[in-house]
C-alpha cells in the first residue's frame, strides 16, 4: 500500500514536526522485567481489546474475560476483517508476481456478495500501485534486482506476530513493520491510534530487543474508489505511558472480576452491545 518513498517521507516529516524520538529506558518493551512495563498480572489479554479505548468503561473486558461472553459479529467489524484480508492477500500476491510471474487476481470464493465490489476495488487499487512502482524502479535503474525493486514498491513486512506474554498480553499481531516503524491499517472509525501503536512497538521490542520509535497509521476508505490517509507518530514516553495505564486498568478489571458497568453511550457497532444492554 505504501511505497518506500512514501514511508521515508512520513517518517522524515514526523521527525521534523514532532521532534526526535526520546524514549526513557524504563519504557522500552525489553524492560518487561521491571515496573512500569512489568504487568501486574499475566492474563493474556488481547491488545486490541483495550488499547484503542473503544469501550469507555472497559465493560467489554468484563463481559469477555470474566463472564465468557462471545462477541457478536457486526457488519462494520466483518467488513474491516474482510478488507484487511484482501489487503494482505494483495501484498502476498504481489511477491508471487515478482518472483514467479504469477498474475495478481482479486479474491473470489468466500467473499460475501455485499463486499465483493469493495474487495475487488481495493485489490485492484493495490495491485496497480505496486506493480506500477515495481516496473518504474526497475526501468529507471533505481533498483538493480527484482528483490530491491519489490522492496521499493512494497517495503512493509506484513502481519508480524510476537509473543505478548512479557507484557501480560496474548500473541500480538501488528499489521506490518517497515523501516523500523510499526504500521497499522484501519478501515473504520479509529481513536487512540498512537497509544495502540506504542503497544505494538513495545511488544516487538520485548520480543526482538530492537527499538521501534515510530508508528504509522493508515486510514483507508473504500466506496466506489479507494482513498487513504497515512500519519506517522513518534512513539515517545507519552503514548507508551498511556498504553501501560490502559493495560493496567484492563488487567485490574479482569483480575478483580469487577463489573465497571455500561458506558452512558455505546456505539451499536460494539460486538458486545446487545449483551451489555440486555
UniProtKB/Swiss-Prot annotation:
Cofactor(s), by name = [4Fe-4S] cluster; Mn(2+)
The Gene Ontology terms for molecular function here are: 4 iron, 4 sulfur cluster binding; metal ion binding
Q: How does it assemble?
A: Can form a Cascis complex with Cas4 and Csa1.
What is its induction? Slightly induced by 20 J/m2 ultraviolet light. Member of the csa1-cas1/2-cas4 operon.
Designated name of the protein:
CRISPR-associated exonuclease Csa1
Provide the family line.
Belongs to the CRISPR-associated protein Csa1 family.
UniProt keyword Manganese present:
yes
| NCBIfam families, per database record | cas_AF1879 (TIGR01896)
Q: Where does [4Fe-4S] cluster bind?
A: 55, 266, 270, 276
- Cofactor: how and how many bound: Binds 1 [4Fe-4S] cluster per subunit. May not be required for nuclease activity.
> Biological process (GO) annotations?
defense response to virus
List UniProt keywords, sorted A-Z: 4Fe-4S, Antiviral defense, Iron, Iron-sulfur, Manganese, Metal-binding
- Summary of the function given for this chain in its UniProt record: CRISPR (clustered regularly interspaced short palindromic repeat) is an adaptive immune system that provides protection against mobile genetic elements (viruses, transposable elements and conjugative plasmids). CRISPR clusters contain sequences complementary to antecedent mobile elements and target invading nucleic acids. CRISPR clusters are transcribed and processed into CRISPR RNA (crRNA). A ssDNA exonuclease with 5' to 3' and perhaps 3' to 5' activity.
